[in-house]
Amino acid sequence: MPISRRGILVPGATGTLGAALALRLHEQGVAVAVAGRDRASLARVSRACGNAPARAFDAYDLDQCARTVTWAADELGGLDGVVVCVGSTAFGPAESVGDVVAEHLFTINALAPMAFPRAALPVVGPGGVIAAITGVVVDSPPAGMADYSASKAALSTWLRAVRREQRGSGVTVLEIRLPHVETGFAGRAVLGSAPVLPTGLPVAEAVDAIVAALSAGARLVKPGRDAPLDIER
């Protein structure tokens, strides 16, 4: 699909990956709207993207997440897609995580990333896309990351079911199942410390794959055998 007709909303644009994606889309001529939690970071990303429309949101307020989609469609004169880059992590054995942290992870990694596409489905038309980042933990959940992995698996399952529902609609549902990316994300865990991790994928390579997948109308980005990332249509 062409990705520059009307515009794309990037929730989570104040994170390293979301900011890089929004900037890349802007550089390719896409009209972007950016949304995030940190207002100062959001203002910087907006300026870098040619003073793109920007809106702060609280991922715990699911109605606000949904309203952000309507806001973006109004600001951009329509909406072709939403790419959700929101996320949080925690480390530690399941018995040490606690229900408060578990609720946080499921809200930030599943419920909020579902709220944006859910609201976007009636807005984007044929040729549009809804997309969200999950992770390789969906396929192989590691010890010490049970709740994080479960929250990402919930989002992955939801995306796959919605993809089936959207068959014939012309709307693409893209799951971005990334490996470890060098964003510093693991160092911002809400609980615990990350284990020793191998060198992650450069942010630019992850962004390249996401943009290529959006352009191709793909359904999945995942680690590849002969390349860091594969794109499946």
Where are each of the predicted segments found?
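Substrate-binding pocket helix/loop in short-chain dehydrogenase/reductase
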Residues: 93-94, 101-104
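Conserved glycine-rich cofactor-binding loop
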Residues: 14-15
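Active-site helix of classical SDR
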Residues: 117, 151
